[in-house]
Amino acid sequence: MTNANPDAFYIHTFGCQMNQADSGIMTAILQNEGYVAASNEADAGIVLLNTCAVREHATERVGHLLQHLHGRKKRSKGRLLVGVTGCIPQYEREVLFKNYPVVDFLAGPDTYRSLPLLIKQVQQAGKGATEAALAFNSAETYDGIEPVRSSSMSAFVPVMRGCNNHCAYCVVPLTRGRERSHPKAAVLNEVRQLAEAGYREITLLGQNVNSYYDPLAQCNFAELLAAVSCAAPATRIRFTTSHPKDISEALVRTIAEHSNICNHIHLPVQSGSSRILRLMQRGHTIEEYLEKIALIRSLIPNVTLSTDMIAGFCGETEADHQATLRLLEEVQFDSAFMFYYSPRPRTPAAEKLTDDVPEALKKARLQEIIECQNRISASLFSQAVGSVVEVLAEAESRRSSEQLMGRTAGNRTVVFARNGYQAGDVLHVRITGSTSATLLGEPLISTTL
């Protein structure tokens, strides 16, 4: 801590893409008040943990880091300031202050504008002082703040915040409040600026983007997506996350009709059993989900689909689990985020249902789901061998500096020989091999698109 700048900050970001976007917002707010972003934690006199509360494992990771920072704070004789932001403080304020005395201040997702004031208050009050700003603000969308972005190639643009769905297992309504949408004009202005700055890819973000609605512009998400596509015609456009019950034919047609909107849809289903979906309060049946899949594939024949799955939810039987495996086989998702259920305090499931599936059985069922999905992914990816795909190069491959990795419009990862290319280039690659998670290929031409 001897060389750490007391006005320099470093942000550890956990969890979803929205948290990554929020870290950029916090960075902008702090820099506008004269604070300096440090390139590593050791140089920072202020350390922020931007946290996720969706799963117990994410909370545990934050706890481990706070223990590490406790030791560092002792060595600094209390000069290091530690703040916890994001979903965990909104959800577990008293637990944080009680169990982790290293924490000086807390800020929830709607109160990041208060960060400079919180820091000043703690600095002025001295050792042992704690501050918190955790009020929900149903109007806060951080419009007017230009986020600091870690990439000059790919950008996240939040278009709405919060969620009204109240799925039984989910903490998001408790941590991010009710839905509110960014004004259409503000979204389009940000998109145009990014396109003019040369960004190759823009991802529209929301806990449930399909619920987007700007009452002033009378604009729903399908209409916003079309407008974004036209505002940045040379830029790839993605969006996440969608709720199956809110996928409309108008939205699917918009994707099909605009060539720069990526042909990939992430559509979390969570279980293959309608009975379990009812307990989860998902608002749809498996039959209705499959109707949405059929609609998507009828209008976007080359679409790729991904999903989320939860193994071992309350009351899940072996028959329910087998229904999940059958759904995977029927839909043929490209990929899936797969977890076993862990109850989150204050959620409907934790308060009203019994967590009656033994942990060992949860883990066994999860492993079966993973193995099933890996087989499907490997089969789908092997079918791409011999084809030519357009790839946006994103970064150096983890395994070799002589290779780059990038993604197709369908969100498939491709690793290929560098051949003079660099991140940000768009090129055609012939697929020569595959694994269950990656396509392997060779660039076709020596000039970028």
Swiss-Prot record:
SMART domains: Elp3. It comes from the Bacteria. Residues 382-445 form the TRAM domain. GO terms for cellular component: cytosol. PROSITE patterns: MTTASE_N (PS51449), MTTASE_RADICAL (PS01278), RADICAL_SAM (PS51918), TRAM (PS50926). Residues 7-124 form the MTTase N-terminal domain. NCBIfam families: miaB-methiolase, MiaB/RimO family radical SAM methylthiotransferase. This is tRNA-2-methylthio-N(6)-dimethylallyladenosine synthase. It comes from Chlorobium chlorochromatii (strain CaD3). The gene is miaB.
